[in-house]
Regions:
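Vicinal oxygen chelate
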Residues: 1-5, 11, 32, 75-117
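Short hydrophobic/aromatic beta-strand micro-patches
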Residues: 10-12, 65-67
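Helix N-cap motif at beta-to-alpha junctions
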Residues: 14-16, 69-71
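Secondary-structure boundary/capping motif
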Residues: 18-19, 63, 99
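Short amphipathic alpha-helices within nucleic acid-binding modules
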Residues: 22, 72-77
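Conserved short beta-strand elements that form part of the metal-binding/catalytic scaffold
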Residues: 27-62, 102-105, 109-115
Length: 117
């Protein structure tokens, strides 16, 4: 017997209701109460990084990576909402896809990933 998927991602928040609203409005991620977020977009990576990684801020223990269909469209929407978005062509590759990074209102790092076709 083995694990066959992620059952949930749980994290602390100063204002859980405001954070749920932010994720819903800006990323389309809906998580309310104990109703699971249904996704059918593909596999999920689970990967530990070294404690000295500079892939995300060192004052945070984790970073969420969300798969997106149209990175340019979402980046435009986020910037229109005055959300700082960082992109770097060095992060992108034809084999893996394209990336952008943002932070939620509580400073949690979020990576947005448009997989390669």
């Amino acid at each position: 017997m083995a694990v066959d998927g992620i059952g949930g991602i749980f994290f602390r928040a100063e204002d859980p209701d405001a954070l749920r609203q932010w994720y819903r409005v800006n990323l389309g991620v809906v998580f309310e109460g104990y109703t699971p977020w249904q996704q059918a977009s593909g596999p999920t990576m689970i990967m530990p990084f070294g404690s000295d990684t500079d892939y995300w801020p060192d004052n945070k223990q984790w970073m969420n990576n969300f798969r997106v269909t149209d990175l340019d469209e979402l980046v435009s929407k986020l910037r229109q909402a005055d959300i700082a978005v960082v992109t770097d062509p060095a992060w992108d590759s034809p084999e893996v896809g394209r990336f952008a990074r943002i932070h939620d209102p509580e400073g949690n790092p979020i990576e947005l990933w448009e997989p390669a076709e």
